[in-house]
Amino acid sequence: TKKWSATDKDAQYQNMIDMFFDSDSPENIDVKEYDYPTTAHGYDAYNAPYMYHMPLSGGMCPTSDFMQLFDGFDRYADGSIRVTDGTNCGNGHYLLYDSPMGIFANVEPRLRAWVIYPGDTHRGDVQDIKMGTYVGNTPISPFFDDYSYATSQKTFQQTNAYTQKPKLLYMSPNSGSAQEKVTLDDGTTINASGTDGPFYSNGEATLTGIYVRKYLNPDPSSLIGEGKCAQNFILMRYAEVLLNMAEAAVEM
């Protein structure tokens, strides 16, 4: 029997992941089945975090618009996810957390089953997802004060924090030897952009700071590669039909 608890967020998150892979559930209406090596696919090869690229990765990058559909985030008046203590993301000071997953602490667990958070685990590995590392003092003012479409071509590597000497913001154009290194106060040296990016000159890592989790095989022993993945895709479930009907009734 599967474990589920209304008060245990980890159990709810794991239960939903298990549901994605339960091809024998009596709720299933339409399941697309695969079998390695004859009828395999490459979903993990195209969408897994960058540390597993075989040879591709990060093809599906969930956006903030998608995450805003889930309850539990602190929000601005316009409904967008709050990242500063100001009235919008361009003023005030950045909110600080003890870990990258802190911003997701109160979010409904099903989002965690859909996407991989920075600092969360997949296939038994901690996913070191970060665009850069800031070494300046706190509080931290927003790097941009205008996030409108008109200024969308301005990048973080054009900000004063990155261009000044000594710089306060470290970012990497690519993985491997292209990584900028940051030495922490305790003497530890880390990669500025982690193992999974985003990297500002490599589009194969996530472009949004989030990776998809749904249907990625969590088994560390499973194969990753084009034509090597064999997990089934549950295209329709009975519960989904009921929820769609309820949503349609509300929206009519």
What are these regions (language model features)?
Residues 1, 30, 107, 111-116, ...:
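Extended, hydrophobic/aromatic-rich amphipathic alpha-helical segments that build helical scaffolds
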Residues 1-180:
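An aromatic- and glycine-enriched ligand-binding surface/loop that stacks and positions planar moieties
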Residues 183, 187-237:
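Active-site beta-strand/loop architecture of penicillin-binding DD-peptidases
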